Amino acid sequence: MNVLIVYYSLYGHVAAMAQAVAEGVHQVPGMTATLRRVPETLSEEVIGKMGATEAQKALSHVPACTLEELEDADAIVFGTPTRFGNMCGQMRQFLDATGQIWMRGGLVGKPGGVFCSTATQHGGQETTLMSFIQTLLHHGMIVVGLPYSFAGQMRLDEVTGGSPYGATTIAGGDGSRMPSENELDAARFQGRHIADVTRRLRA
C-alpha cells in the first residue's frame, strides 16, 4: 500500500519534514511512501530574488504530483509552509484543481494528514493545519493527526514545533533554522502512524 506525500518547499524545510514522514511510513511492514511536489507558480526571477534558486535546484529531482496520483494513493499526507496563517498559494492552487475528484468522491475514505513549517514559534502553525484539514474533510478523507503518544510534542526544554493536528517545524525569520531532531521525529511518528492506520483500515 502506498502513502503519497505531497508538499511544497521553497527553502527545503518542508522537504526535510516530508522525507522524515516517508521514513516513518517505511517502518510499517507492507507500506511504501511516494514523495511528490506541487507545481511551482513563481517565476525563476522571483525565486532568485527570494534567494531560493539553489534550494530549488536541490529539490528538482522530486517529480510534480499529478491529480491521478491522489486517487491512486491509499493515503495522502500534505506538507506546506505557512503563508499568513494558511497553506501556501502553490498548494492552494493545486488543491483547487481537484474539483472533479471531489465530484466523483475520489478521496472519500482515504486517510489524510498534514504538516507544515512557520518562520516563528507562534507564526500560524495550528491555524495552517486546521484550515488545511477543512479541505481534507470536504473531500471525505479520514483525518489522522499527531497523537500525544508522541511525547516529543510535550517537551519544554527546547523550542520545538508539533501539535495534535500534525508535525511542524520552525524555520526562523531568515530561514536559517532547519528542522530539529525532535521535529523530524514527530514527522517520522506521523508517517508511521498514518501508515499503520491505513494498513488497519485496508485489512
From Swiss-Prot:
Its EC number is 1.6.5.2. Belongs to the WrbA family. FMN binds at residues 9-14, 82-84, 117-123, 138. Gene3D superfamilies: 3.40.50.360. SUPFAM superfamilies: Flavoproteins. Keywords: Flavoprotein, FMN, NAD, NADP, Nucleotide-binding, Oxidoreductase. It comes from Solidesulfovibrio magneticus (strain ATCC 700980 / DSM 13731 / RS-1). One of its GO terms (cellular component) is membrane. This is NAD(P)H dehydrogenase (quinone). Substrate binds at residue 102. Its cofactor is FMN. It comes from the Bacteria. GO terms for molecular function: flavin adenine dinucleotide binding; FMN binding; NAD binding; NADH:ubiquinone reductase (non-electrogenic) activity; NADP binding; NADPH dehydrogenase (quinone) activity. It catalyses: a quinone + NADH + H(+) = a quinol + NAD(+); a quinone + NADPH + H(+) = a quinol + NADP(+).
